[in-house]
Amino acid sequence: MAKKIDAYIKLQVKSGSANPSPPVGPALGQKGVNIMEFCKAFNARTEKMEKGMPIPVVITVYSDRSFTFETKTSPASYLLKTAAGLKSGSPRPNTQKVGTIARAKVQEIAELKAADMTGADIEAMTRSIEGTARSMGLVVED
């Protein structure tokens, strides 16, 4: 018989640097999960990724206080900022543009995020990423 699911916890944790401090500790502690066990497992799974990259993680907590977790790809905004070499997006994206990004790079990001996105096809996912780029003040060039 399958274990009874007690809760789902969604967090964004930097790759390779999960530790018991907030937000990880309090979120897992109130559900009775072994925090250090999660931190060690998460850091082991993300050790090959770029250090400090924000990784969305969904933790499934079971009634016996055991857990499983699933990592997702980094947020599109983070991937766009690193691809364009920016520190942050534009505070006024409609009037103040902060950089440019090639359409080929946007499509590459869409293909990377395809597993986590619910788009019908790669073109739709690419358009979605282009919209995110525009809302950050990036100009998408051919």
Swiss-Prot record:
PROSITE patterns: RIBOSOMAL_L11. Pfam families: Ribosomal_L11, Ribosomal_L11_N. The keyword RNA-binding applies. Keywords: Methylation, Ribonucleoprotein, Ribosomal protein, RNA-binding, rRNA-binding. One of its GO terms (cellular component) is cytosolic large ribosomal subunit. One or more lysine residues are methylated. SUPFAM superfamilies: Ribosomal L11/L12e N-terminal domain (SSF54747), Ribosomal protein L11, C-terminal domain (SSF46906). Forms part of the ribosomal stalk which helps the ribosome interact with GTP-bound translation factors. Belongs to the universal ribosomal protein uL11 family. This is Large ribosomal subunit protein uL11.
